[in-house]
Amino acid sequence: ANHSAGELTAIAPYILYIMSDDHAAHAISAYGSQINTTPHIDRIAHTGLRMTNCHVTNSLCTPSRGTILTGQYGHKCNVRTIGDKLDPNHEPQMQKLLQKQGYQTAIVGKWHLGVRHGGIPAGFDYWEVLEGQGRYYDPVFISEKGDRTIKGYVTDITTDLCLDWLKQRDRSKPFFMCCHHKAPHRPWQPGPKYKDLFEDINIVEPPTFNDDYSNRAEAARRAEMTIEHHLNKNDLKIDPPAAVKG
């Protein structure tokens, strides 16, 4: 049905889509973490809906993002692996559908769908995104106006850019805002205010720390990214701290 701007604003929900990247469920206290406290995520979980039985067919960054925006498997939206792009002309895309219904649409932060290679964010009234993974400190943001380097920590910057847009948006219309953070994707580089967060905290070894996987499935025994064998530059994306080098 067609609605006037006023009618649409009255019935349409405001949509704020916050994404954290490569964020393990066991690093969220709403899912039982005793080390990582996430009070704001917990509040949303307790007052909203917390999913406990979720699965993904292709857990890489780029295909996951393509699937979320299109509602299609990677082989359908042609975003199968890292390095692929999301064709701006591909249909459907969630933000395009909302835009056609009178929503203001915006995305800030990590896009990772080929912005430098023809994968321009389509269906967004405003977009300002990182190139690929982006940097934690002094990141480069890309928009229709070009590139700009913004001094500071990427999580704070992404949040501030989102807030700036929300404050100046057309309040006669509903909005769809994608606040897509880079963190906590590797390399793990905390912001200045959090760099000493665990300085005086004794972190208990997880019960599986010394597991030899002898009683696990073959697929589990072949898994990489283990602390014992794979905590290296290839895995961390930075040189490991001297204290944890074997």
Question: In which residue ranges do the predicted regions lie?
Answer:
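Formylglycine-dependent sulfatase
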Residues: 1-246
